From Swiss-Prot:
Light emission at 715-720 nm upon excitation at 440 and 475 nm, and subsequent transfer of excitation energy to the photosystem I core with a relative slow rate of 25 nsec(-1). The gene is LHCA3. Chlorophyll a 4 binds at residue 228. Chlorophyll a 6 binds at residue 257. Photoregulated by reversible phosphorylation of its threonine residues. Induction: Induced by low light (LL) but repressed by high light (HL). Inhibited by cold. It comes from Arabidopsis thaliana (Mouse-ear cress). This is Photosystem I chlorophyll a/b-binding protein 3-1, chloroplastic.
Length: 273
């Protein structure tokens, strides 16, 4: 027994020495080999935001930073404008998304305001002298200028001053959300405090009807706003092209087309006939 133990000890020592010299790995025991074949359940990968959203010409690169967290995000960014790695600090992606919302709101107001005088004039609800196409209201002086209470240069300076002040306040709120509620402003500062999100300030001035009281409805309204804002920006572009090509307003264009679709359409207006 003693000799057997001595031989076993000697063999074990020799094997350990050989492993140290040649760097071989320890031989796994039978129980270890058996446990290595145990199949473990793979961890479920986290589901990204907007994983089930429709995609518009999205690329693997655009999907790396457009994760669906923004309203109306369908991965469409062929120029890579929202790519945080390719901007070089020139374009802030969050500011770009914010700018789309603000420009969409202005476009919705502009699209309605540009066509409203024509519609109201045709309906006889306003005097004919004020029922002008949008480009004859003084926006483009060579196309005609309406006579207001002041000359165009005075109105332009006044408009720039008022809009400049409003835009400056908006920029301040962007850099310091909620700061407008801390500065005295004719006793209105409480209503200008905002929600902490500059794009959706809320409050009595910016959400007087209290839309979006819960997270689900607010998300739906944000999506609808972005979609309508994008359509309005395209509509404004269409107004410019229509006015340049046809010389009449968009509502008159519509009436002419409905009266004679064959001779009043895009092709005939562009002289493709």
């Amino acid at each position: 027994m003693a000799a057997q133990a001595l031989v076993s000890s000697s063999l074990t020592s020799s094997v350990q020495t050989a492993r140290q010299i040649f760097g071989s790995k320890p031989v796994a025991s039978a129980s270890q080999k058996k446990s290595s074949f145990v199949v473990k359940a793979a961890a479920t990968p986290p589901v990204k935001q907007g994983a089930n959203r429709p995609l518009w010409f999205a690329s693997s690169q655009s999907l790396s930073y457009l994760d669906g967290s923004l309203p109306g995000d369908y991965g469409f960014d062929p120029l890579g404008l929202s790519d945080p790695e390719g901007t070089g600090g020139f374009i802030e992606p969050r500011w770009l998304a914010y700018g789309e919302i603000i420009n969409g709101r202005f476009a919705m107001l502009g699209a309605a305001g540009a066509i409203a005088p024509e519609i109201l004039g045709k309906a006889g609800l306003i005097p004919a002298e004020t029922a002008l196409p949008w480009f004859q209201t003084g926006v483009i002086p060579p196309a005609g200028t309406y006579t207001y209470w002041a000359d165009n240069y005075t109105l332009f300076v006044l408009e720039m001053a008022l809009m400049g002040f409003a835009e400056h306040r908006r920029l301040q709120d962007w850099y310091n959300p909620g700061s407008m509620g801390k500065q005295y402003f004719l006793g209105l500062e409480k209503g200008l405090a905002g929600s902490g999100n500059p794009a959706y300030p809320g409050g009595p001035f910016f959400n007087p009807l209290g839309f979006g009281k819960d997270e689900k409805s607010l998300k739906e309204l944000k999506l609808k706003e972005v979609k309508n804002g994008r359509l309005a920006m395209l509509a404004i572009l269409g107004y410019f092209i229509q006015g340049l090509v046809t010389g009449v307003g968009p509502y008159q264009n519509l009436l002419d087309h409905l009266a004679d679709p064959v001779n009043n359409n895009v092709l005939t207006s562009l002289k493709f006939h």
